[in-house]
Amino acid sequence: MEFSSPSREECPKPLSRVSIMAGSLTGLLLLQAVSWASGARPCIPKSFGYSSVVCVCNATYCDSFDPPTFPALGTFSRYESTRSGRRMELSMGPIQANHTGTGLLLTLQPEQKFQKVKGFGGAMTDAAALNILALSPPAQNLLLKSYFSEEGIGYNIIRVPMASCDFSIRTYTYADTPDDFQLHNFSLPEEDTKLKIPLIHRALQLAQRPVSLLASPWTSPTWLKTNGAVNGKGSLKGQPGDIYHQTWARYFVKFLDAYAEHKLQFWAVTAENEPSAGLLSGYPFQCLGFTPEHQRDFIARDLGPTLANSTHHNVRLLMLDDQRLLLPHWAKVVLTDPEAAKYVHGIAVHWYLDFLAPAKATLGETHRLFPNTMLFASEACVGSKFWEQSVRLGSWDRGMQYSHSIITNLLYHVVGWTDWNLALNPEGGPNWVRNFVDSPIIVDITKDTFYKQPMFYHLGHFSKFIPEGSQRVGLVASQKNDLDAVALMHPDGSAVVVVLNRSSKDVPLTIKDPAVGFLETISPGYSIHTYLWRRQ
């Protein structure tokens, strides 16, 4: 994750809505607020004493949005979220023919084309499913709508752990019968058949966009491992190409077969969740160790051919699925081997050590070396570090960490960004090793209530407005500034710009689109905005 020292984790602060709103109003004379349309519902805010608020949802009410609004040519839509409590509030303004502003100018460069976006989403862990299903059915539906429907933030990616992970309440794999090398006893437990699979189907039914499923394994069955345990330092027995590696590769196909029987098809699998974890003595939860050389040979001799020769040959294979600190070295080892490289579609990265790994030296260099291998951010959450509180209800800082990471990733060729647990309880679990963390949605089953945190809306500023197939384009600033910004073009040619202000200062701002003119606006302190406009 982007580095946040203990001092940056905010202490409880009183909300200062009036001052922020006043500051933003002075610079927004051209913008006209749009009243909540018939389908949209405003946030019911609640403060838990941190820097911002959560939005409260229950069985009968949850804030919602209309589908993204593209106004007539010559005007723009602006969606605003602020620390003071605004949540993706819509306003509109005219696009000016001439530049009258004196502040920062951001110029769109549509001829500079970069990566096409796959999408945004989160993980349907056992813990997430348990929390969602602990709500009453009407509240469950409102939570799923919040993530996946047009009146929510339009997620189009769901990551699915293959069997248990730390966010499970027990340890299991799909083939726990010892020495079952033919996997005759492979079966999905109730965590899949009663929890995850029904919820994934409900999410797909609610989604207006096609949703892509991504699977990741944490551990193999223990009888395939050198240490005979789900956790701790251990890897597959034997060598790539042998019965242990072949069995583990066929386990992937059996998983895809089993989900296909439940009418679920996967877009991609990762070769292993955090393969470096299983190289560490005493690692506390499910893992399976691979060095880059071991992963290279496993992909080349076992996993790649096994997938390619199965009915799931269209399922993409992503390597690494670990900290970007391991790049570009890990990519060099795997992708300079033509036998491994031919099976690898992309490189998945996690955010937890990003503060040690500058994006340019890792993502940027990897893209330079392997421009045809896509980069995909597959996991992120806050609250996992020893100095961090697990859950901070209403933390604006944590929302900013998310959006800063997303913008940074987009600027360095990453095609998608996936959050970790879709929902957790107020403790940040359940988690069988008590590795509690935060989540964009926190479920309080005692009140049949769930809380949508600032992280949820920060993610929504991207997921709702950047559909699959959108392409990042150039955006150049006229001077040094404290804003984070990224520009993209929708498949239909319309434009979207996301601007994040992590500072306390309001920043007058003009966005120039050579095709249509100038968008005069302001970026208030501690705010995030998404701008949309038609170009033809």
Curated annotation (Swiss-Prot):
Reported effect, G234E: In GD1; severely decreased glucosylceramidase activity
Active-site residues are E274, E379
Task: State what inhibits or activates this protein.
Answer: Synergistically activated by saposin-A and saposin-C, two saposin peptides produced by proteolytic processing of prosaposin/PSAP. Saposin-C activates GBA1 through its recruitment to membranes. The membrane structure and composition in anionic phospholipids are also important for the activation. Activated by PKC in the salvage pathway of ceramide formation. Inhibited by conduritol B epoxide/CBE.
Known outcome of mutating F436S: In GD; decreased glucosylceramidase activity; 6% of normal activity; alters protein stability and increases susceptibility to proteolytic degradation
Result, substituting I200N: In GD; decreased glucosylceramidase activity; 5% of normal activity
Q: Which residues are glycosylated?
A: N58, N98, N185, N309, N501
Q: What outcome follows a substitution of D482E?
A: Loss of glucosylceramidase activity
**Could you say what the effect of mutating M455V is?**
In GD; loss of glucosylceramidase activity; increases susceptibility to proteolytic degradation
Annotated phenotype, changing V230E: In GD1; very low glucosylceramidase activity
Q: What is the effect of changing D448V?
A: In GD3; loss of glucosylceramidase activity; results in glycosphingolipid accumulation in brain and liver of a knockin mouse model due to impaired glucosylceramidase activity
Leader peptide range in chain numbering: 1-39
Summarizing the annotation, the consequence of altering C57S is:
Loss of glucosylceramidase activity
The outcome of changing E274K is:
In GD2; loss of glucosylceramide catabolic process
Tell me what the record says results from D482G.
Answer: Decreased glucosylceramidase activity
Q: What is the effect of changing R296Q?
A: In GD1 and GD2; also found in a patient with Parkinson disease
Q: What mutagenesis or variant effect is reported for F298L?
A: In GD and GD2; decreased glucosylceramidase activity; 4% of normal activity
Q: Which residues form a coiled coil?
A: none
Subunit note: Interacts with saposin-C. Interacts with SCARB2. Interacts with TCP1. May interacts with SNCA; this interaction may inhibit the glucosylceramidase activity. Interacts with GRN; this interaction prevents aggregation of GBA1-SCARB2 complex via interaction with HSPA1A upon stress.
Q: Specify the protein name.
A: Lysosomal acid glucosylceramidase
Q: Which organism is it from?
A: Homo sapiens (Human)
* This protein's encoding gene: GBA1
